[in-house]
Amino acid sequence: MKRAGWLLCLLAPLGLQASPASQSATTDTARPSEHTQVPRIATVDWTIAETLLALGVTPLAVGDVSAYRAWVGEPLLPADVVDIGLRAQPNRELLAELKPDRILISPLAAPLAPTLSRIAPVQSIALYDPQTDLWQRLHEATLTIAALVHKTAEANVLLTDLNRDLEQMKQTLPAELPPLLVVQFIDERHVRVFGRHSLFEAVMQRLGLRNAWQGETNAWGFSVASLEQFLSIPEARLVVVDPIPVGVSERLQEPGLWQHLPLVQQAPVLHLPAVWSFGGVLAARRFATLLSEALQKDARGDRQ
């Protein structure tokens, strides 16, 4: 069944929150507050939660808080944010008790809308769409969310500052860097490698960096690749983004394919803390900052 397939998708290790849908859809038209009070927002989507925090708004409730902390890293969720359970199966009774003013979802969570709309107005915000420019889509989504919480001015500042700061970071990077191969481990022999339509590539483009992965990608901008496929990539710098599954780091230290990859032998692998690879503008800033700092430290020979 379609619904079962959707649940399996969300219950996978990443629980991808994005959708290739190109249009935002709502079950209720946004109503402006007479006193412009910030509405109490619940969401099952981490990118929406991240965007709210970037705008200075703490969400009332978020799905799968513990996994958010592992995969998203920053911005940190305040301790008073209520965990409403799995993003694919939020605790509806708890949500009803919280009485949110609005519930925000991505199109992937559309099967939840009929039941969630009995609790509060539900609005779906499209975040990822391979048919449109990702950077523009994320800007539009940020402004849409900002309008709902009366933070349009803050959103405009956030977006302007991001574009300015990325340009400044670009100027600080070492010259003549090799292409980068950005991955997240699935197990000791398979990774997600990020290419076209990914947040990571969108940031790299704005930093003037080349992506070594030119293979096909899915709607969220990654391919699942085996380490053997990297044997055919002659020159690239490996960048590994946390989290790494339990036990994988230890197995990679053992003699095996990883240790014999030319990409691993020719230069130290760059490791970055967790960044939500399907995130919004704040994830874009975090990735840009972490990557540029890692490249600068490496150029100085400082790998501590």
Model-based region annotation:
Residues 38, 45, 49-53, 92, ...:
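Extracytoplasmic/secreted envelope proteins and their assembly/folding machinery
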Residues 10-19:
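Hydrophobic h-region of N-terminal signal peptides that target proteins for export
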